[in-house]
Amino acid sequence: MLLLLLGFLGPAACWALGPAGPGSSELRSAFSAARTTPLEGTSEMAVTFDKVYVNIGGDFDAATGRFRCRVPGAYFFSFTAGKAPHKSLSVMLVRNRDEVQALAFDEQRRPGARRAASQSAMLQLDYGDTVWLRLHGAPQYALGAPGATFSGYLVYADADADAPARGPAAPEPRSAFSAARTRSLVGSDAAPGPRHRPLAFDTELVNIGGDFDAAAGVFRCRLPGAYFFSFTLGKLPRKTLSVKLMKNRDEVQAMIYDDGASRRREMQSQSVMLPLRRGDAVWLLSHDHDGYGAYSNHGKYITFSGFLVYPDLAAAGPPALKPPEL
């Protein structure tokens, strides 16, 4: 994930954060850190870090594990947590004191099993907001060694924060979304309606440009260019997890799959960058048959995010195929 972070730190992907005001040419805020030692669930709960790879703007405090927003805007966060043998894993992405935004979870406790779970989300932050990782406080939860990585960076500064740095120049093209689903889904051969339906979402975290329809589960490209997409899903016990990232009607771009028969809840993540034309649709397709499903609850196991990395202002052409009827 660090390579992805460093690759996206160009000015077209995120405007770097510096002192706002006259003479400031860019807005920059980015960090990436790691914890290299185990951590068991305690009353403290905050995951702290002992290794910092990047801390542009100095907004991340490794000793407390907290990122503090200095420039309001939309930020992309990702984290990976390793599970200790004989322990369960439950790590939450938290905003401010107790606003859980997304969750990484694995309750597989086989002897000697070393596993990891990842999660990502985009959040709209105001000045002074904090974002951190919380390990479940019960003693049956723990991070293994190496424990975790945590990264985040400013994708789009708010217009008011951006104005002093940009002056009278035309505003940059912007398109970004992040959504979560708090309900599980279970496939059924007897279910009515079409099989190829986009996965719908009930929680909208960010929707800059209004290009994502959460209820329909479809992102529609308004600005041609290169987009980054990531998605994470929880696996239902004893069910097969099969979810595809689709472009337009039937173009499979990436896939999550797990047919393990475990009765424990687990998670899978995937990400990809796609070139899109105006009118292209991107959505998630869950295999809707008996024996398939995906797990979520109020902790938001299921997430879907995407944002414009580099616009292609010269692109032209007719709109692409429409997504399936919902």
UniProtKB/Swiss-Prot annotation:
Cleavable signal peptide: 1-16
Q: Where is this chain's protein located in or outside the cell?
A: Secreted
Q: A Gene Ontology biological process annotation?
A: reduction of food intake in response to dietary excess
Q: Which residues form the C1q domain?
A: 24-161, 170-315
The record's SMART domains line, in alphabetical order, gives:
C1Q (SM00110)
**Single GO cellular component term:** extracellular space
Q: Which UniProt keywords apply?
A: Cytokine, Repeat, Secreted, Signal
Q: Which Gene3D superfamilies match?
A: 2.60.120.40
Recount the UniProt induction comment for this entry: Up-regulated during acute colitis induced by injection of dextran sulfate sodium (DSS).
Pfam families of this UniProt entry? C1q (PF00386)
In terms of PROSITE patterns, this protein maps to:
C1Q (PS50871)
Q: In which tissues is it expressed?
A: High expression in testis, kidney, and brain. Expressed in brain and kidney (at protein level). Within the brain, highly expressed in cerebellum, cortex, hippocampus and hypothalamus, and lower expression in hindbrain (at protein level). Serum levels were increased in leptin-deficient ob/ob mice (a genetic model of hyperphagia and morbid obesity) relative to age-matched lean controls. No difference in serum levels were detected between mice fed a low-fat versus high-fat diet for 14 weeks.
Q: Where is this region: Disordered?
A: 164-193
Q: Is Transferase among the key words of this record? A: no
On whether Secreted is a keyword of this UniProt record, the answer is: yes
Q: Name one GO molecular function term.
A: cytokine activity
| Domain of life according to the entry | Eukaryota
Q: How does it assemble?
A: Homomultimer. Forms trimers, hexamers and high molecular weight oligomers.
Q: What does this protein do?
A: May be involved in the regulation of the inflammatory network. The role as pro- or anti-inflammatory seems to be context dependent. Seems to have some role in regulating food intake and energy balance when administered in the brain. This effect is sustained over a two-day period, and it is accompanied by decreased expression of orexigenic neuropeptides in the hypothalamus 3 hours post-injection.
Protein name (database record) = Complement C1q tumor necrosis factor-related protein 4
* Gene name for this UniProt entry: C1qtnf4
